[in-house]
Amino acid sequence: MNRKTLFTALLLLLGRNVCSAGEPGPTIRFAEIPAGWFYMGSGGPGADYDETPIHKVVISRPFRMSVTEITNAQYEAFDPSHRALRGKQGFSSGDNEAVIFVDWHQADAFCRWLSEKEGRTYRLPTEAEWEYACRAGSCMHYSFGDRLPKAALKNQEEHHSFIPVDLTVAQSAPNAFGLYDMHGNVEEWCYDWYGPYFRGDQTDPVGYADGFYKVTRGGSHSTPVEYLRSANRMAMIPEDKHFLTGFRIIEAPYPATKPVPASTAAEPVAQHVAHWVDMNDQPRYYTPIEYVIPPQISTAPMYPHNHCPAVTWCRNGDLLAVWFSTISEFGREMAIWHSRLRCGADSWDEASLLCKVPDRNMTGSSLRCDPDSGRIYLLNGVEAGGWWRNLALLAQTSDDNGATWSRPQIVSPEHTPGHQVIAGMIRSSEGWL
């Protein structure tokens, strides 16, 4: 047997195919992922409720996945300007470290650039393709069992300040499909819009037709190890980018599966304009009215620690309150809930979930109703992970008294101190909030 034949036989035996893409430039190596099926999700207690229900998924066609996350050198063959971000906050300065500070649109653009260059179809993996490739035939918490090997751990805890770690790819053993760093190193963007799972067998699912957040998977450095599980779901505003997230790619046609229709549900809210009565200047005193009223039925858990409220009025005469609900003020489970005191009512509605970037701390909310337009503004912090120190700032608006809300926009994109808002938003004479 000559050397070439022996090399080819070894590749087939290992179930992977090493090839080159994006020449000239750093080689991207791919592994062959066979068609098959698996059980997606987990039992999902508590904060992991979005991993339920467990459901059977068929991946009907084989595909090829990059054996590592895309590196700085590989990404910068497409976007040389990214080199200025190497070493930001102390992370990822080397050619062979995973690229970070890349948003979903940039990751998607890299795939389209490479596709055009090579005459093949490269794209981000769907969430189902990602979990199937990560599990590689396993059914435990991780592809290696219920614990990760020590070599795969990179500062698996959270801190209020940045603690740099080496993000060089492929420094620990691959999974059974030959893929490195599927648990940790950096989070990885997926193709899908984030949304709840549903029951029933599925074939080649592609997620939702629209949404607020794009799925990320795999967890990262500087993250508690439970967020690195095969089933763990995370997501981000697609324009967000930070030191925890990068991506890997697959070579495969875009799935023909139809996406799940996006939810168009709106809260039933009166849309009349209230007539406000002048009550003169006499002070009035009322006993407090409880506004944190847990719902009897909810698709998301409400936690015991409810704090940091903000309240505003609505043009229809309602009062609207928001606050965070969490187990720990440093926790990634933190979510923004809200309630309404309807015009003329003497008790608040049951609370309901308003805003949740999956697996991100969301400390700090502020509300304001513009007296001229009736538009309601919500400003809220969003962390890269846990804690509440390095927040970016997102904004949403409502033009129908809080019945529906706009897509979140990042208005202060840097995850840095100084972006924790609290109640008391004002408008300056120049119109600034």
Describe the residue ranges of each PLM region.
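Positively charged n-region of N-terminal signal peptides that target proteins for export
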Residues: 1-4
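Functional-site microenvironments in short loops/helix caps that host divalent-cation chemistry
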Residues: 32-33, 39-47, 84-231
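Boundary at the C-terminal end of the N-terminal hydrophobic targeting segment
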Residues: 19-22
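Short, structured beta-strand segments at or near domain termini in extracellular proteins/domains
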Residues: 243-256
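A short glycine-rich, aromatic-capped structural motif
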Residues: 24-85, 105, 184
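Short proline/glycine-enriched turn/loop segments at secondary-structure junctions
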Residues: 204-208, 234-241, 299
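Asp-box/BNR beta-propeller blade signature and adjacent active/binding-site loops
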Residues: 260-433
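Sec-dependent N-terminal signal peptides
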Residues: 6-14
